[in-house]
């Protein structure tokens, strides 16, 4: 029985992945599948690195861990969970296309090169309640945000 489950959602200009797993699980990702630019860990902890490399990043989540993983593109990677984990990845569809990513904490000004993604909870954005893995193309306008302890990212095509 698998102790680590992966989900993938292809969107219009990017893809989202989700991983949910038990403690003490090792997951390997082949270079041909490595399109993740940003990792958002919402529960648990673990470490990730390039295979056969002694350098790795540790995500110890007391809140949220948001990591830029661009340096891992083009490499086989390995992830080890220290405790039950739930994490999401923001993936480019084209390795030549770069994106900027960040988590939002307040209301903000959007632009038409950006997308909003909900990773945890039920925030209210401009009066609309979102669910996990909901996403929307932004416009050049102001967005009123009520996070309600949710985790929401904004990703901008460069």
Tell me the role of every PLM-derived stretch.
Residues 1-158:
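Jelly-roll (double-stranded beta-helix
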């Amino acid at each position: 029985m698998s102790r680590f489950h992966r989900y993938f959602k292809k969107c219009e200009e990017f893809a989202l992945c989700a991983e949910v797993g038990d403690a003490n699980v090792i997951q390997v990702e082949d270079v041909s599948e490595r399109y993740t630019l940003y990792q958002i860990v919402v529960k648990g902890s673990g470490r990730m690195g390039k295979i056969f490399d002694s350098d790795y990043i540790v995500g110890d989540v007391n809140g949220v861990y948001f990591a830029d993983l661009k340096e891992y593109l083009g490499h086989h990677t390995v992830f080890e969970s220290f405790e039950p984990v739930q994490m999401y990845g923001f993936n480019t569809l084209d390795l030549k296309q770069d994106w900027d990513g960040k988590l939002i904490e307040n209301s903000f000004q959007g632009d038409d090169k950006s997308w909003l993604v909900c990773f945890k909870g039920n925030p209210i954005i401009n009066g609309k309640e979102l669910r996990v893995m909901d996403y929307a193309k932004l416009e050049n306008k102001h967005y009123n945000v009520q996070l309600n302890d949710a985790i929401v990212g904004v990703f901008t095509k460069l």
